[in-house]
Design a protein with these regions (language model features):
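Active-site glycine-rich loops that stabilize anionic/oxyanionic intermediates
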Residues: 10-13, 81, 201
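Flexible "cap/lid" loop of the alpha/beta hydrolase fold
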Residues: 95-132, 169-178
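Conserved alpha/beta-hydrolase "acid-adjacent" motif
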Residues: 204-210
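Conserved acidic catalytic loop of the alpha/beta-hydrolase fold
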Residues: 59-75
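Catalytic active-site module of serine/aspartate enzymes centered on a nucleophile-bearing elbow/loop
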Residues: 221-258
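Short beta-strand/loop motif that positions the catalytic acidic residue
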Residues: 191, 197-199, 203
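Gly/Ala-rich beta-loop-alpha elbow adjacent to hydrolase catalytic centers
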Residues: 78-83, 87
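Conserved alpha/beta-hydrolase
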Residues: 26-48
Length: 258
């Protein structure tokens, strides 16, 4: 039976942005399953479900866990950005054969609010009560933080696909010190599977300096790879293929051993 890669998108996203990676890994014989986080299956131009605003990381993780358990054998969990944090949470629940964390958001205990991150969310966090409302970056913030290596045409096409995101989840990631439930907490001692952590040196929303600390959190099982010519959008920015190829090479020995 082919190994399964369970792909978890990040903030504002959907299964659509895994198209490149699906093509690569299905071509290598993997079964790829792309998750859709709760309340993200919507028209980007539509009105978001009001329940989205108060949806917790733990709600996302619960929904994903149900999907993963239906797969049978433990999958490779591949997460991008916030999806990378959700993969870590699921990994600590013993649900993964391996974790592939692409420019991942960091769990609690790692201070990630660098100046570039604050700028990336400026229009969101300057609105009182953002933690209980659906939210979305402005086009300028998305370009600055994630899409700056894309062409102008690609930036617009990508941004036009972005849906609203949970203000609650954003709060739990960025302001974990004030989250009484500790939604973004991950017990690294429970992550025992191999972990690949990928950073982009030009990333402004999950800076490489922060992603390195994520890798160190799992130092007994992790491999860290930083790409000098990449930023946050490693799923589709120029030369995305070299990232996918590196991931495939890292996974190959695990696949052979299975």
């Amino acid at each position: 039976m082919a190994d399964t890669i369970f792909m978890i998108h990040g903030m504002w996203g959907g299964p659509w942005y895994w198209e490149n990676y699906r093509r690569v890994f299905e071509g290598e014989g993997y079964r790829c399953v792309s998750a859709t986080l709760p309340y993200h299956d919507m028209d980007p131009r539509g009105v978001p479900d009001p329940r989205l605003g108060t949806t917790s990381l733990l709600d996302y993780a619960e929904a994903l866990e149900q999907e993963v358990r239906q797969l049978g054998a433990k999958p490779i969990l591949m997460g991008h950005s916030m999806g990378g944090l959700l993969a870590q949470i699921l990994g600590a629940r013993g649900l993964a054969k391996a974790l592939v964390l692409l420019t991942p958001a960091s769990p609690s205990g790692i201070m990630a609010l660098t100046p570039s991150v604050v700028r990336s969310f400026w229009s969101v966090q300057t609105k009182w009560g953002f933690w209980r409302k659906p939210m979305r970056q402005t086009f300028g913030e998305a370009v600055y933080s994630m899409l700056h290596l894309l062409s102008e045409k690609e930036r617009k096409e990508t941004y036009d696909k972005f849906v609203y995101e949970s203000g609650r989840a954003a709060f739990e990631i960025g302001y974990w010190l004030f989250d009484s439930r500790g939604a973004s907490r991950v017990d690294e001692s429970k992550v025992t599977c191999p972990v690949l952590v990928v950073a982009g040196a030009q990333d402004r929303i999950t800076p490489a300096s922060v992603v390195r600390r994520v890798a160190r959190k799992y130092k007994t099982v992790s491999t860290y790879k930083e790409f000098e010519n990449h930023a946050h959008w490693v799923v589709a920015e120029p030369r995305w293929q070299e990232v996918a190829e590196y991931v495939g090479g890292w996974l190959r020995p695990l696949r052979t051993a299975s």
